[in-house]
């Protein structure tokens, strides 16, 4: 029974209906044409791969901000946070992470703290790698206060192919670094907004691993001082 449960744990629940549908169509195709059946089973395997939900070894420290998503650090710049969160006209450091269709799309909490506000904003579906995607695309914005008293923002952004954002958070939730909180289907972007003068530990073009890569350190500790937990 445990192995059965573990099998479902490693696949995000958002993928169940897709995998079942792909598998059913594949069996139907195979009954008529072997080659079409093979194509269908390849598509089913890719669907399983896309919705994979692996455990990660999360660095544990109240001073850390970790990557909420797998992908490439597309851009680091000063920018205004989403206006719908009511943070005013004070710029923050924005770290943008672009996810292609081969990345893990499960999103994770970037720091220990409390969720202060959430806002869903319907929008367009520009290519998520473009800078204007942060402003115009469909997005789910989350404002949190870390256990160190820092306010940070993380935003799930739909892309050219992604057409569904899932966020399981509610205002008032107490959250821990590395916890899973949602998913974006089929190519997307996640922005993280941090206070100015935050000590960043990533650079543009770097590959980030959600739940593991340290984006920033408010305390500037040495890596040997961190503890890690599997989550």
UniProtKB/Swiss-Prot annotation:
It catalyses: a 1,2-diacyl-sn-glycero-3-phospho-L-serine + H(+) = a 1,2-diacyl-sn-glycero-3-phosphoethanolamine + CO2. Is synthesized initially as an inactive proenzyme. Formation of the active enzyme involves a self-maturation process in which the active site pyruvoyl group is generated from an internal serine residue via an autocatalytic post-translational modification. Two non-identical subunits are generated from the proenzyme in this reaction, and the pyruvate is formed at the N-terminus of the alpha chain, which is derived from the carboxyl end of the proenzyme. It comes from the Bacteria. Belongs to the phosphatidylserine decarboxylase family. PSD-A subfamily. The modification Pyruvic acid (Ser) is found at residue 188. It comes from Rickettsia akari (strain Hartford). PANTHER family: ARCHAETIDYLSERINE DECARBOXYLASE PROENZYME-RELATED. This is Phosphatidylserine decarboxylase proenzyme. The active site is at 188 (schiff-base intermediate with substrate). GO terms for cellular component: plasma membrane. The keyword Cell membrane applies. InterPro entries: PS_Dcarbxylase (IPR003817), PSD-A (IPR033175). Its main location: membrane. HAMAP family: PS_decarb_PSD_A.
